[in-house]
Amino acid sequence: MTTQEFIDAIKGMTVLELNDLVKACEEEFGVSAAAGVVVAAAGPAEAAEEKTEFDVELTDVGANKVKVIKVVREVTGLGLKEAKDVVDGAPKVLKEAASKEEADDIKAKLEAEGAKVTLK
């Protein structure tokens, strides 16, 4: 059977027959025809949506642990022991649902002391 004959055979099928063909191909080859469609459809929706709230996560303390603890105390309002525990337990989320400006400010302060921060 040539490629053209195969295409002509598909053209002559009903929607139900095409559906059965797709299911048979999925089973035979262990693939899913829907996976590509889902990924393609999800991409533009995410691009159009801009986040307004961020979680600020301390991912790495760096060399200036004492200075990072001071900044963590400042931005979270925690006591010395609690702030030290957070820093020692990195990666940890320091602030949840922070505005973009607040998250950027916290990130800048921590990075100035040598810490690594991720906004999620």
From Swiss-Prot:
Belongs to the bacterial ribosomal protein bL12 family. This is Large ribosomal subunit protein bL12. Forms part of the ribosomal stalk which helps the ribosome interact with GTP-bound translation factors. Is thus essential for accurate translation. One of its GO terms (biological process) is translation. Gene3D superfamilies: 3.30.1390.10, Single helix bin (1.20.5.710). The gene is rplL. It comes from Lachnoclostridium phytofermentans (strain ATCC 700394 / DSM 18823 / ISDg) (Clostridium phytofermentans). One of its GO terms (cellular component) is cytosolic large ribosomal subunit. Keywords: Ribonucleoprotein, Ribosomal protein. Homodimer. Part of the ribosomal stalk of the 50S ribosomal subunit. Forms a multimeric L10(L12)X complex, where L10 forms an elongated spine to which 2 to 4 L12 dimers bind in a sequential fashion. Binds GTP-bound translation factors. GO terms for molecular function: mRNA binding; structural constituent of ribosome. InterPro entries: Ribosomal_bL12, Ribosomal_bL12_C, Ribosomal_bL12_C/ClpS-like, Ribosomal_bL12_oligo, Ribosomal_bL12_oligo_N_sf. HAMAP family: Ribosomal_bL12.
